[in-house]
Amino acid sequence: MADRYINPKVTTVSTGIPGRHIWSARHNHVVIDDSAAHDGPGDAPGAGELFLAGITGCATLMMERLARSSKAPLKRVEVSMEGLIDTEAKREGPAVFESARLKFVMVGVNDTQAREMVETYKRR
């Protein structure tokens, strides 16, 4: 049986290169760059992309868990996400997403099963 509580931990550190940081979780490391528009290197994924990646990663894992628990014949799931940030919006603090859209593609389940799994995801 799974533990009741999990406690994910991450750390991000600057590298001495303006706009470049290293994000770490356990023994895994990812380079994060600020965009060239903000004077960063712009080569590695940015914080907004990693934020969206966290959401899509959670969604794919949950679809697999839901399929296993309901014995649905899910063979593959792909979740993509895009967001819109207005860099010229007049507000205090950092830029925020104006909107974001998730797209689910599932193979092996019928449309009804796929819709039910997505609705369950949206409620959690």
Predicted features along the sequence, with ranges:
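Extended beta-strand/beta-hairpin segments
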Residues: M1-A53, R65-R124
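Alpha-helical metal-binding/catalytic segments enriched in His/Glu/Asp
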Residues: C58-A59
